[in-house]
């Protein structure tokens, strides 16, 4: 996979770390609370084996319309804005569902139950599957062994709601 700047990254570099994977979008109603709270979470675990990986996605109401080279400026100057710098590793725009979904998300979705019980409209992909990610800022927590541990609904933005699970995985 590639970082937002085009640099290739091997997931081997995250071996032995607890990883939080999030599909992100700059122009979503959850953008400001999600980015600011994930920064608070990253700061809390700054000296531990914990990383957050963000994957911009335009499959939900087209709320990440920018080209890869423009996404960081949208975050810095629009939402959240004010020079905001996310404390997560940001990747290139990624398909998280459908015929062209990235294999990482195929793997994560197969290992963790969906957080939704119904589908919404304004989904821009096919085919639609029962375990699909259904909105921006859905999260997957992965243990140091690379095994998916749990999946969080996009409305879970408070870092306190994730800390027990993160602490469990860090101490494993």
UniProtKB/Swiss-Prot annotation:
Show the SUPFAM superfamilies listed in the entry.
Thioredoxin-like (SSF52833)
UniProt cross-references to InterPro entries, sorted A to Z: Glutathione_peroxidase (IPR000889), GPX_AS (IPR029759), GPX_CS (IPR029760), Thioredoxin-like_sf (IPR036249)
Tissue and organ distribution = Expressed at high levels in the ovary and at lower levels in the gill and hepatopancreas. Not detected in heart, brain, thoracic ganglia, gut, muscle, epidermis or testis.
Q: List its EC numbers.
A: 1.11.1.9
Q: What class of enzyme is it?
A: oxidoreductase
Q: Does the keyword Oxidoreductase apply?
A: yes
Going by the UniProt record, its keywords in alphabetical order are: Oxidoreductase, Peroxidase, Selenocysteine
Q: Gene3D superfamilies, alphabetically?
A: Glutaredoxin
Alphabetically, which GO biological process terms does the record hold? Answer: response to oxidative stress
The chemistry this enzyme catalyses reads: 2 glutathione + H2O2 = glutathione disulfide + 2 H2O
Q: Which residues form the active site?
A: 28
| Molecular-function annotations in GO | glutathione peroxidase activity
Induction info? Up-regulated in hepatopancreas following bacterial or viral infection.
Q: Which domain of life is it from?
A: Eukaryota
PANTHER family reported for this sequence:
GLUTATHIONE PEROXIDASE
Family that this chain belongs to: Belongs to the glutathione peroxidase family.
Instruction: Quote the function comment for this protein.
Output: Protects cells and enzymes from oxidative damage, by catalyzing the reduction of hydrogen peroxide, lipid peroxides and organic hydroperoxide, by glutathione. May defend against reactive oxygen species that accumulate during the immune response.
The name on file for this protein is Glutathione peroxidase
Q: What is the lineage of its organism?
A: Eukaryota, Metazoa, Ecdysozoa, Arthropoda, Crustacea
Q: Which gene encodes it?
A: GPx
